From Swiss-Prot:
Protein name, per record: Proline--tRNA ligase
Single biological process term from Gene Ontology: prolyl-tRNA aminoacylation
Reactions catalysed: tRNA(Pro) + L-proline + ATP = L-prolyl-tRNA(Pro) + AMP + diphosphate
Pfam families from the UniProt entry: HGTP_anticodon (PF03129), tRNA-synt_2b (PF00587), tRNA_edit (PF04073)
Family: Belongs to the class-II aminoacyl-tRNA synthetase family. ProS type 1 subfamily.
Gene source species: Salmonella arizonae (strain ATCC BAA-731 / CDC346-86 / RSK2980)
Subunit structure: Homodimer.
Length: 572
């Protein structure tokens, strides 16, 4: 490709509304342009990267035995009503009616459509297992699209769905997809972790997320410094303290704390160690409970894990925090003065709280706290559960090493769905025993557009993008200095351009009448891995300058050797 016949569209300045580096660089490198909130046009440079990601995904899906299909973006509402998600899904589901007043949705995912296809096409266990995939546009009406294509409303996704007559068969495909995903992200040159995850709104049993490590990531991922243990922070178990609870050394005392409505204020005003404080959070209880609320207690320096809390049997799902009005109606005190002593609602405490002695907590009286509280002396030990987020330095749940926490960008997610959708849509086949058998499902997704942004978040410097070779828009940039004034520079540039293309190498030759500084800046901004610079001065010695984008190293290569040098560097 020649720049004179190409839409380069680079920008010198960073657009003001671009918050994260991937959004900034995708705009500056001329990869995308915003059409409306959460909607982007992919320009040629961006589309080349997107297609490379898509091709790697497709190759590995095919290698893993998945079968490609293509399903409509527009889906009839009756399928969503049949599955029960018409009511469950929030405003992210874009609903509309056609000219015949028939309701439809723009698909955010395709479980209903593929299950409907399978229930109509398959009839016998002999046809299974099958794993279908597509690379298709999705639409989710995000309330606040942000970070460019990282959290857009329209995006490209690879979604796959497998169907089985046994858990063993599902596990086999799940393991194959886990391995395929690991190959996909390894081939793309990404630093990633596969982590245990919560199944979320899609539902089901086992689940793993594939997270690209990046400072701008929205997720906290947890992994051991010794073993292979890795989990999303929502799921990571906080091990109970191994040391026994210390004996009481203080009497419980009621203290006036009129200006301490938060843990931070309590610690500052009374010079307390934060690990000797407890915070109490009130949430809604399940329907038909004797009490409308449940009290959840975590240590002052810990955070409540809302996913764990929501799974407690007496806590309503979705987790809903009580309002101040609801709290006062039951406790007769405000949120800043709550604690376990004389608490009139059921109490659940975190494992770390159960190991505390001589601690401070609200007295359930406005402006007052108890100091020196001890379990079983001042208040009975309530139900104990793991309800907090782990913190760096906690012991790893597998007993090997301690935990590290890093930020991650979720680029893939695999689920064992079980029979959630097949039961709702009555997708069954005749089993080996001749009886009707409901199918067991797996679900496997990759955010194709998100992968592009995640790769940039991991691969950039002060000059622009530093693409991994496998997904770079071009492999080689040819920069002929003053080619419009030097016949030998132009002649050699054209010769190398043809020879490299004949070797199957993707080349961008900058044949614009631009200053060298502009040419260098543009090629570094868009992140082409290998650059050759052809100039009269080096040609006097039969040399060409080669520069590797990732390291910035430069070297002089003889003109007769440069093609072989590049082929070896790219293809190995």
């Amino acid at each position: 490709m020649r720049t004179s016949q190409y839409l380069l569209s680079t920008l010198k300045e960073t657009p003001a509304d671009a918050e994260v580096i991937s959004h900034q660089l995708m705009l500056r490198a001329g990869m995308i342009r915003k059409l409306a909130s959460g909607l982007y046009t992919w320009l040629p440079t961006g589309l080349r990267v997107l297609k490379k990601v898509e091709n790697i995904v497709r190759e590995e899906m095919n290698n893993a035995g998945a079968i490609e299909v293509s399903m409509p973006v527009v889906q009839p509402a009756d399928l969503w009503q049949e599955s029960g998600r018409w009511e469950q899904y929030g405003p992210e589901l874009l609903r509309f009616v056609d000219r015949g007043e028939r309701p439809f949705v723009l698909g955010p995912t395709h479980e209903e459509v593929i299950t409907d296809l399978v229930r109509n096409e398959l009839s016998s266990y002999k046809q299974l297992p099958l794993n279908f995939f597509q690379i298709q546009t999705k639409f989710r009406d995000e309330v606040r699209p942000r970070f460019g294509v990282m959290r857009s409303r329209e995006f490209l996704m690879k979604d796959a769905y497998s169907f089985h007559t046994s858990q063993e068969s599902l596990q086999e495909t799940y393991d194959a997809m886990y391995a395929a995903y690991s190959r996909i992200f390894s081939r793309m040159g990404l630093d990633f972790r596969a982590v245990q995850a919560d199944t979320g709104s899609i539902g089901g049993n086992a689940s793993h997320e594939f997270q690209v490590l990046a400072q701008s990531g929205e997720d906290d991922i947890v992994f051991s410094d010794v073993s292979d243990y890795a989990a999303n922070i929502e799921l990571a178990e906080a091990i109970a303290p191994q040391t026994p609870r210390a004996a009481a050394t203080q009497e419980m005392t009621l203290i006036d704390t009129p200006n301490a409505k938060t843990i931070a204020e309590l610690v500052e005003q009374f010079n307390l160690p934060i690990e000797k404080t407890v915070k109490t959070l009130l949430v809604k209880a399940v329907k038909d409970s004797k009490s409308p609320l449940v009290a959840l207690l975590v240590r002052g320096d810990h955070e409540l894990n809302e996913v764990k809390a929501e799974k407690l049997p007496n806590v309503a799902s979705p987790l809903t925090f009580a309002t101040e009005e609801e709290i006062r109606a039951v406790i007769n005190a405000g949120p800043g003065s709550l604690g376990p002593v004389n608490m009139p609602v059921p109490v659940i405490i975190d494992r770390s709280v159960a190991a505390m002695s001589d601690f401070a907590a609200g007295a359930n009286i406005d402006g007052k706290h108890y100091f020196g509280i001890n379990w079983d002396r001042d208040v009975a030990t309530p139900i104990v559960a793991d309800i907090r987020n782990v913190v760096a330095g906690d012991p790893s749940p597998d007993g090997q090493g301690t935990l590290l926490i890093k930020r991650g960008i979720e680029v893939g997610h695999i689920f064992q769905l079980g029979t959630k959708y097949s039961e709702a849509l009555k997708a069954s086949v005749q089993g080996e025993d001749g009886r009707n058998q409901i199918l067991t499902m797996g679900c496997y997704g990759i955010g194709v557009t998100r992968v592009v942004a995640a790769a940039i978040e991991q691969n950039f410097d002060e000059r622009g993008i530093v693409w991994p070779d496998a997904i770079a828009p071009f492999q080689v940039a040819i920069l002929p200095m003053n080619m419009h004034k030097s016949f030998r520079v132009q002649e050699l540039a054209e010769k190398l351009y043809s020879e490299l293309r004949a070797q199957g190498i993707e080349v961008l030759m900058d044949d614009r009448k631009e200053r060298p500084g502009v040419m260098f800046a543009d090629m570094e901004l868009i992140g082409i891995p290998h650059t050759i610079v052809i100039g009269d001065r080096n040609l006097d010695n039969d040399d060409i300058e080669y520069k590797y984008r990732r390291s910035g190293e430069k070297s002089l290569i003889k003109t007769g050797d440069i093609v072989d040098y590049l082929v070896k560097a790219i293809k190995g």
